[in-house]
UniProtKB/Swiss-Prot annotation:
Originating species: Streptococcus pyogenes serotype M18 (strain MGAS8232)
Enzymatic reactions: L-glutamyl-tRNA(Gln) + L-glutamine + ATP + H2O = L-glutaminyl-tRNA(Gln) + L-glutamate + ADP + phosphate + H(+)
Protein name from the UniProt record: Glutamyl-tRNA(Gln) amidotransferase subunit A
Catalytic center residues: 77 (charge relay system), 152 (charge relay system), 176 (acyl-ester intermediate)
Family statement: Belongs to the amidase family. GatA subfamily.
One CC-aspect GO term: glutamyl-tRNA(Gln) amidotransferase complex
EC number per UniProt: 6.3.5.7
Length: 488
């Protein structure tokens, strides 16, 4: 018997009633991972021994009836530090790295007696939109194994979508939770910048990175955010604002809610069938009592260019620490210190990572800083101001998560610009530090379409309220790929 169709609340009831044990649930989860892993390739590391040991300890002390997550397995993206469990960032550079500490998000999960079942595949150092730049393997879409799962958190998305696990953690720098959530038909949230501690997250773009949850449903997503969100003295960017319960507005109606639909989000480059799906969703929100009106975010068209200058510049600084001296991969053909640095970084980093390091180094270099990095920061401010103007009059922004459904494996990985444009609709949210969610909203050619809801800072409860209202009157979240037992 598999438990992957049961919600977290249903699993909790079974655990409390002792109809199953944490060990049995962990064993079944490990079986689900193994039976599906060859097809989708979600995991880099499955921590079977550690997970079973932790489950046994939880069983020994007993399930806490007041702790919803007690004994629940969790998959963690492989750029989030896990003490004693390989944390590679999907890079040759860290192929053998075992952290000596847990990320705060992981420590928070452990504090709630969640069981880390394994580490999921991703684009190397979270740089990519297809999970094809991983040093270890290419993850495949849960709905069609000839398509990409999205990225960079592709493994975390497919692990949930394929029924390997119920919950997972990812990170989002320019869309890396929302895009794979959309491509795989699951719920993925990028919280407000600072809501979840970045301590223990292997840094890519420090002003953009944010850890967030994946789940099959809106409520389960919010329940996981309840676990990982916290202020943290170990993270200087951690926000002091903490919502007591992110599920508090789920189930409330949305009558009177004002939702903005930016015309730029339905313009050039957006697949016509995606546009139709979003417009149908807008009508559904109106039927639920919300007002949906067209607005403009005029500077969003510069988002991709701004992002790749800022993110690459921050990455070029953050990745300087990987030099072959202290930990990780070291080139064995070096004859002196300079060659250790050069050869290690040349051999240890993949092409996409090296491309972004070079772009960032150029943008920060003397003579080009003002023309690129400084100007990108100024345009970033304009993008933030666009959002501020809209949120002065509206509660949420609605739009597609991605311009297309999942594209084929090996179709865009040799065309960086085309790959970058796939994040056209998600990047502005990171630049502004806002919360955004992707929820299932339909299908095009048998592939899931994601609907994005964006809120002002710290409006996660309102986002969850609207997302849950839409979910309650649609069945897209209930449809599952064949690998999960569905009929698609």
């Amino acid at each position: 018997m598999s438990f992957n169709h049961k919600t977290i609340e249903e699993l909790h009831d079974l655990l409390v009633a002792k109809e199953i044990s944490a060990t049995e649930l962990t064993q079944k989860t490990l079986e689900d991972i193994k039976s599906r892993e060859e097809a989708v390739g979600s995991f880099i590391t499955v921590s079977e021994e550690a997970a079973l040991k932790q489950a046994a300890a939880i069983d020994a002390k007993g399930i806490d009836a007041d702790n919803l997550m007690s004994g629940i397995p969790l998959a963690v993206k492989d750029n989030i530090s896990t003490k004693g469990i390989l944390t590679t960032a999907a890079s040759k550079m860290l192929y053998n790295y075992e952290p000596i500490f847990d990320a705060t998000s992981v420590a928070n999960a452990y504090a709630k007696d969640m069981i880390v079942i394994g580490k999921t595949n991703m684009d190397e150092f979270a740089m990519g939109g297809s999970t094809e730049t991983s040093y270890f393997k290419k993850t495949k879409n849960a709905w069609d194994h000839t398509k990409v799962p999205g990225g960079s958190s592709g493994g975390s998305a497919t692990a949930v979508a394929s029924g390997q696990v119920r919950l997972s953690l990812g990170s989002d720098t320019g869309g890396s939770i929302r895009q794979p959530a959309a491509f795989n038909g699951v719920v993925g949230l990028k919280p407000t910048y600072g809501t979840v501690s970045r301590y223990g997250l292997i840094a890519f773009g420090s002003s953009l990175d944010q850890i967030g949850p994946f789940a099959p449903t809106v409520k389960e997503n919010a329940q996981l955010l309840n676990v990982i969100a916290s202020s943290d003295v170990k993270d200087a960017t951690s926000a002091p604002v903490r919502i007591a319960d992110y599920t508090s507005k789920i189930g409330r109606d949305i009558k009177g809610m004002k939702i903005a639909l930016p015309k730029e989000y339905l313009g050039e480059g957006i697949d016509p069938e995606i546009k139709e799906t979003v417009l149908a969703a807008a009508k559904q929100f109106e039927a639920l009592g919300a007002t949906v009106e067209e607005v403009s975010l005029p500077h969003s068209k510069y988002g991709v260019a701004v992002y790749y200058i800022i993110a690459s510049s921050e990455a070029s600084s953050n990745l300087q620490r990987f030099d072959g001296i202290r930990y990780g991969f070291r080139a064995d053909d070096a004859k002196n210190l300079d060659e250790i640095y050069v050869n290690t970084r040349s051999q240890g980093f993949g092409d996409e990572v090296k491309r972004r390091i070079m772009l960032g180094t150029f943008s920060l270099s003397s003579g080009y800083y003002d023309a690129y990095f400084k100007k990108a920061g100024q345009v970033r401010t304009l993008i933030i101001q666009d959002f501020d103007k809209v949120f002065a009059d509206y509660d949420l922004i609605l739009g597609p998560t991605t311009p297309t459904v999942a594209f084929g494996l090996d179709t865009l990985n040799h065309d960086p610009v085309a790959m970058y444009l796939a994040d056209l609709l998600t990047i502005p949210v990171n630049l502004a530090g806002l919360p955004g969610i992707s929820i299932p909203a339909g299908f095009v050619d048998g592939l899931p379409v994601g609907l994005q809801l964006i809120g002002p800072k710290y409006a996660e409860e309102t986002i969850y309220q609207a997302a849950a209202a839409f979910e309650a009157v649609t069945d897209y979240h209930k449809q599952q790929p064949i690998i999960f037992g569905g009929d698609k």
